[in-house]
Amino acid sequence: MGCLSSEPTAAPAMQPRAPAAVPDDAHNGERVKRRDVTPDGVYLPNANRLAPPMRSPDYVQISTAAAMTLGLVPGRMHRCRCTRCLNLLLTYPEGCRANCAYCGLARHREADHDYADRNFIRVDWPSVPVAQLVETVAGQGAATPFERMCISMITHPNADADTRSVLKAWTGRIAPERVPVSILSNPTTMTRDDVRALRDLGAEIFTVALDACTPALFERTRGRGVGSPHRWAKYWEIFHAARDIFGREKIGMHLIVGMGESERECLEVVQTVKDAGGHSHMFCFFPERGSLMDHLPATPRDQWRRVQLARYLIDYMGVRIDRMRFDEGGRVRDFGLSRAELDAVIAAGIAFRTSGCPGARRADVSACDRPYGDSPPSKIASYPFQPARRDRARIRRQLAGAAP
């Protein structure tokens, strides 16, 4: 069977640090909300000035890669075009009211950054008027570079209604058949009716960012352990509602690898999601600047590559976790395929690309390529392009524990 001979890296204890105190005048975005300034056009994050009071559904934030693709900011991405997915993020002066330990958008960052200036998955997120954004993409017609659009919700009292408003504005000008729409949901504020409404308005895929792979880890990084409102059971409740409403192959689950779970624990969630008719979208833990886990190490590459490979086998190759073998620490020691079969999957390289909602090409290649969202370009975790021969050679060394 397909075994690996590396000596696995031990998982560190991943304990969030305590947050800094938030000044009274910074709570709930008060400094920004008191500004008597009307937002004007695109806002580029700048921590050296006070942000204007921008608010969804009139404004959204977009990833740096999307802003580069649209020509709103200069630059180009290392070894790839910018992105094939237009990622939108709801925005409010109050920001996200959750306090997830690994997230750059967390509530505790009121102490040091206005919401519109906070980094998220390693990059800045410029703010753009929704009307301008929709008209720009609509004007591109069939030539648009985007194969998918995704609305990312945050924890805010208005998030559900504003997500519907942004979705209506988009589908009113851009047919979902031309640019399919995904929703990255916030289960904490949602009901089953909210899920159904998004489907009825034209969303194709519904995803849940569980992120933490065990109930205890979820509680420590996303729940009561950090004064955050999220609950493990609620996330699964909304995921199962989405399965019923959107159907099989139209649901997804975000998972972060390397926050203290074992490889087996992570892959058990992957198998559960697959059995429900969904796919898992994987992120390699990276210490986000300003987060409560920014002092902790990134996921060791041998661990990450094993989980990437095993997840691909479960999601797309029909391999079940009960065919795999694990050591006493829960690390994958056998992937449940012959050596020749496993070598062929590794050689193809697709297992090591960014995972997410599919694009126009094939089901196992994500439109949401999130360039360098979980690693620097010098040490790529999720390849936003097809790995070249030299990349695949490095991946093999990483799987063998012989390369960082």
What is each residue range found by the language model?
Residues 1-19, 27-84, 245, 267-404:
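Auxiliary Fe-S-binding modules of radical SAM enzymes
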Residues 193-198, 260-274:
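Catalytic cores of alpha/beta
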Residues 97, 111, 145-149, 250-252, ...:
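Conserved mixed alpha/beta catalytic, RNA-binding, or beta-rich assembly cores of soluble enzyme
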Residues 107-136, 140-162, 177-194, 201-236, ...:
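Core AdoMet radical
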Residues 59-109, 148-151:
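N-terminal pre-triad scaffold of radical SAM enzymes
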Residues 147-173, 258-265:
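Conserved glycine-rich "GG(E/T)P / GGGxP" loop and the immediately following alpha-helix
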Residues 184-188, 224-225, 238-264, 285, ...:
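Conserved strand-turn element in the central/C-terminal portion of the radical SAM core barrel
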Residues 164-178, 230-248, 301-317:
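Alpha-helix-loop-beta-strand connector modules within alpha/beta enzyme cores
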